[in-house]
Swiss-Prot record:
Top-level taxon of the source organism: Bacteria
Family named by the database record: Belongs to the UPF0125 (RnfH) family.
Origin organism lineage: Bacteria, Pseudomonadati, Pseudomonadota, Gammaproteobacteria, Pseudomonadales
Organism of provenance: Pseudomonas fluorescens (strain ATCC BAA-477 / NRRL B-23932 / Pf-5)
Name used for this protein in its record: Protein RnfH
Membrane spanning residue stretches: none
Coiled-coil spans in chain: none
């Protein structure tokens, strides 16, 4: 008898395009196995699926090799930030302060 299948989604957003892939995987699959089954790496060859951080519904999963997914889960593949948010805020505040100084 065949294993029961569950439906999940895999999401990834690159700078220039995004993908949301629906895939059927065997019940009891790990997050990493579901990523491989989705073939997201073929659409985005720049992804290192073994090293990139992943999560489910916005919550990062620390051990994707052991985490068992559930029916309806949305697996999200995260990419690194291009700029440090603290540094961006600091630069924006400095620029605003400089603009206020020139206006006075």
């Amino acid at each position: 008898m065949a294993e029961p299948m569950i439906s999940i989604e895999v999401a990834y957003a690159a700078v220039d395009r995004q993908a949301l892939i629906r895939v059927q995987v065997p019940q009891g699959s790990t997050l990493r196995a579901a990523l491989q089954a989705s073939a997201i790496g073929q659409q985005f060859p720049e992804l290192d699926l073994a090293a990139c951080p992943v999560g489910i519904f916005g919550k990062q999963v620390s051990d994707p090799e052991q985490h068992v997914i559930q029916a309806g889960d949305r697996i999200e593949v995260y990419r690194p930030l291009l700029a440090d948010p603290k540094e961006v805020r600091r630069l924006r505040a400095a620029k605003a302060a400089e603009a206020r100084k020139r206006e006075s």
